């Protein structure tokens, strides 16, 4: 146990020494990229609903990881929380620049879900996705963002709470109520109104 703590301390010190010049090693970046790319991309895609924009934002996020890695501190926050703060800020900047609230583009959503569905399956799936996205549009921005962090980015309630700055129980309540609200919207067909 003592050896493990000493080893972690040595690794942390090596990392601090490497970062004095503000440079992340290729191995560190590769490990981060391979471990987090899917979660980051899915969260971004969920929010912007456009494959090409999501890819651009994703590359900006990983560029920011390289340039801001020397600012990361394990004492302040877990790496996941730090990374998704960058991701969330990048998505916010995207919407601010585009001056749009929520845009629906279903041209490539099937790429995230299945490899090669049949035309019939595509038609059924597109209808279901369209209904879901219209129902999601009825939610408040905060609710959509929390659901995206929970389901698209696969963050735990505690990580979302730390990222947003609210209690873990508050996140649980928002997730539960948002899902109930979505269920009610979909069951009543209220998403068809607009």
For each feature predicted by the language model, list its residue ranges:
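Sigma70-family region 2
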Residues: 22, 49, 62-77, 97-98
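Arg/Lys-rich amphipathic alpha helix in sigma70-family domain 2
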Residues: 71, 85-106
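DNA-recognition helix of helix-turn-helix
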Residues: 143, 152, 158-188
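Internal acidic/polar
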Residues: 5, 11-12, 101-126, 156
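Amphipathic, Lys/Arg- and hydrophobic-enriched alpha-helical face
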Residues: 33-52, 67-68, 136, 185-188
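N-terminal module of bacterial RNA polymerase sigma factors
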Residues: 1-39, 46, 70, 194
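Structural recognition of an alpha-helix C-terminal capping motif at a helix-to-coil junction
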Residues: 56-63, 77-89
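Short helix-capping/turn signature of helix-turn-helix
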Residues: 36-38, 47, 138, 148-155, ...
